[in-house]
Every structure is written in C-alpha cells, then in structure tokens.
C-alpha cells in the first residue's frame, strides 16, 4: 500500500475514540450480576462526569494494515462547555513524521496538516469544517476530527480486573464492551460507514471519579483497506483552563470547497 493511501486510515483511529463526547447519561446495566452492574454504573458515571469538564488528553496509537504500520502520538486540551480546544498529533510512517493540528472554536473546527497541504489553494493552511454537518457532508474521517480527544462511548458488561497507578493517581482497572445502542445516530452512521468493530475496552477510573486512562482496540475499513487499530488515551488536568488561538481568516478555506481523499462522503 502506498504511504498516502495508508495515511487515509489514520482518521479511523480517531474515529474509534470519538464517540463519547456528547455527554450522554450513564448507561443502565443489562448484566445479571451485582458486581458487574456496580462496575458498569461506576465506569459510565466516570465517563459522564469527565465529559462535562475541560481536560488534557495524551494519545498514542498504532494502525496496522497490509503489513504496514502507522504510529501516532499527540495531545489535546478541550473544554466541552465553551466548545474550545487544541489538538496536535504526529503520525509516523516510513521514517517520516506527519503533523496534524486542530483548533476547535465553538461550532467550527480548523485542521492543518502537511498530509493534505498540496490540495489547498495558495496561501491557505487550514481546512475549516462545520461541526454540526461534518459527518453528513464530509464522511466519517471529518466526523472523527470534530470529536473530543480521549472521549469514550457508553459501556456495558463492565468487570473489574485490577488496580494501577496512572500519572501518580491510584486507579481501578476495568474491562468492558461498547454499548452501541447508546450511541447517537451520527455516531452510529460514522461507525457503520467505516465498518468499525470494537474489541474489549480497558478503562482506568481514579478514586476522584474520573477516567484517567482508556485503551480501545478496533478494526475498521477505508478505501477498501482493512486496519487493526489500538489507541491509548491518558487524561489529566480535569477542570483546567483551555486557551485557543483561532487561525487567521486569510489562511483558512471551507472544506466543502476542497476535494481531499478521506474527507468526502
């Protein structure tokens, strides 16, 4: 597979973790054991609690397809109340590092990367996307880029599997499955379009009631290529102040006016 074609799978890694930022209510458990029911309630309450707070998320991931690998790492700071945030991701492929930057400003997200800079008009550095219509207009790749880093979907069949210290915080580790019935129509559509299948989810919840780490393994498909994806997100600084600098209007271009592979439905 050519390098550029493999890079088109990267948004799927973001999509796999982009289905929990809607602030949904804690999901009720459908399990039959008390311990699992309690664990399910605890984890979903932690997800809902964190979805309301500003947070810093460090993200690392591995995308494997056709015998090739993409490693990605980065971090972001997002405030769901003001709908503002910044995200930077570095994508490693074939000895090269491809940067991807995002700025969220209310109902608009700006995306910049050398990956698609050749598609942009002269003098333009940033794609401008409308958050509300990103999925319908541009497909699942763009939908993923409008979601909160480190977000988690509602979970079910949760079981406690151990304890661990994450960045100095004592946590309880759980394994779980995604409760797809609790996803929004837009989230379901994006996952269906990319043939996303979730594996077991691992979640680390601290005594403060917040999720401090999550690991998601999935398989997905884009452009006829199937990929196996593993993404780990480590969350910290809940309640922090988030500052953003919006790109100058003269450097932005409406994404609907630019044809970029992976960003059209």
List PLM regions with ranges.
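N-terminal export and membrane-targeting signals
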Residues: 1-11
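Subset-of-secretome marker
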Residues: 2-4, 20-265
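C-terminal motif of bacterial Sec signal peptides marking the signal peptidase cleavage site
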Residues: 15-18
